[in-house]
């Protein structure tokens, strides 16, 4: 057994790119018209599997295929390890039988959503996986079913999201990562991920247009179909899945210039409720842009309720966090 240090980049995990790094070359994928089982590492037939697969091999050899096949579904046998993280009470690595439902993982194993908040979505498969909505929480988890709903098994990542999560922001976050990790070899992946991130940024900052949704879908399909490796082939998943299941959230950002989850800072408006304001001045003290005016109430003088100048406000949220009387509202 020999252990080699990989290239480090996300794309270097792709099979042919991984072999290239072992050979000492740049970790770029190559065309698959010749499969690695025919010509792989140093142009020799090569069988590449991940660590989890190799860990199962000794048990299958010792106990037989029938023993291993007792667990799982028709098309996905055995168990799967997931990294369960996000808005869930119990986080960590969990090993579950194939075919278990998302509900069982999130609620029975994960302990549900903290603070009594509502489950919104779960993203599976790593950075290029798709987001699965609450309406599909009883979906059995296996390779085929995850692919059918626009996600994938991938590296076994599972990020739970609650009602405070903005799906446009989620798509933008993952596209930012994927555009940086693209090796740039194929135009579709290099330019497609970059352009999708640019459009998502425009939408989240209030410059979105109705036609942007269809443009994102078109870019996503072209990027997936024309890319050389699985990174480009799956990179649009965060965008396409969030549009598929949360289109209304995109429309709210574009048409009403509003972020329902109150995450996209450029679309937020902070307002002091004068009837609730205690005129303590806490909000004005922490405002970095001096956008809040008013007069502090003292024993000798009457105060003036504070107000926020929208032109000066940088939407940092400091006023909202500092107010103990819930006199600052976010719209």
Predicted segments with their positions:
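Terminal amphipathic helices with adjacent charged low-complexity linkers/tails
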Residues: 1, 114-148, 244
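Hydrophobic alpha-helical positions that pack around
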Residues: 1-98, 110
